[in-house]
């Protein structure tokens, strides 16, 4: 209660061991705080086996911005650019893009350089992502994801660096083959996650895919494990694929994405296409 008063309402209670948008609860009044903590602890224990929770200031109109980094064991670290992952449902990302529109370059350079420096100081090795909430020209650190993320292709598309390949080379003890000044970004990329779920209620839609056709064309990339007659199980995340569109401009990337989604066929189950 004392911490919430100092931070100021609204606050958000988060599960320490959580992820994927689960184990979070927003609290607007002091009267609701203790029950929210209790409920979130119970949810965290059931979902993650860890009842530990923590509290943050809740931002009312933030954007979800993240910085991609690569670091090797030789104290070299670079940041590859930012991604805007603000389009979400149930605190889970649905549409991601790079670069993030409308954020002053000086602010992005400052936060990107800090992320690279932090990676060096903690001795980080591999691919990683620093996640932030962004509001009123300020970045608020959320967490660092120490892995390759679903949305990494939009960064690859705009700077030409294969993040998975670099991660393997780093794991083999190799030095990064480039420095910060060598990284040049070009164009715009957007990713849409394709989920097996009702597009209106978000209820999962497992079952057999009776027909499947992936889109193609200039600037289009599709990452998916499914095929015709594949059975989507009910036990895991509902994502069955992702479509990435690249263009010289944001408008071109959006236009290509719209065409790609109109061409994509996934029948037998419901999807968010």
Label every model-predicted segment.
Residues 1-6:
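Gly/Ser/Thr-enriched, mixed-charge loops and adjacent short helices
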Residues 7, 15, 20, 27-273:
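ATP-dependent carboxylate activation and anion-phosphoryl transfer catalytic cores
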Residues 12:
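N-terminal cofactor/phosphate-binding cores enriched in small/glycine residues
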């Amino acid at each position: 209660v004392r911490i919430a008063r100092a931070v100021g309402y609204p606050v958000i209670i988060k599960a320490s061991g959580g992820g994927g948008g689960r184990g979070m609860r927003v609290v607007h009044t002091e009267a609701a705080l203790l029950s929210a903590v209790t409920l979130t602890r119970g949810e965290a224990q059931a979902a993650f086996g860890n009842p530990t929770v923590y509290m943050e200031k809740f931002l009312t109109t933030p954007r979800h911005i993240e910085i991609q980094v690569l670091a090797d064991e030789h104290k070299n670290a670079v940041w590859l650019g930012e991604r805007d992952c603000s389009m979400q449902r149930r605190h889970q990302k649905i549409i991601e893009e790079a670069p993030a529109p409308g954020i002053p370059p000086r602010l992005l350079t400052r936060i990107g350089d800090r992320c690279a420096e932090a990676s060096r100081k903690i001795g980080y090795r591999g691919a990683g992502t620093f996640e932030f909430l962004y509001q009123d020209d300020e970045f608020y650190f959320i967490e660092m994801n120490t892995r390759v993320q679903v949305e990494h292709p939009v960064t690859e598309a705009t700077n030409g660096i294969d993040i998975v390949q670099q991660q393997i080379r780093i794991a083999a003890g190799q030095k990064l083959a480039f420095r910060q000044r060598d990284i040049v970004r070009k164009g715009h990329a957007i990713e849409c996650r394709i989920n097996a779920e009702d597009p209106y209620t978000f209820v999962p839609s497992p079952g057999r895919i009776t027909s499947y056709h992936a889109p193609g064309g200039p600037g289009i990339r599709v990452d998916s494990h499914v095929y015709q007659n594949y059975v989507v199980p009910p036990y895991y995340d509902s994502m069955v694929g992702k479509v990435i569109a690249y263009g010289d401009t944001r408008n071109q990337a959006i236009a290509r994405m719209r065409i790609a989604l109109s061409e994509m066929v996934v029948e037998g189950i419901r999807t968010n296409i």
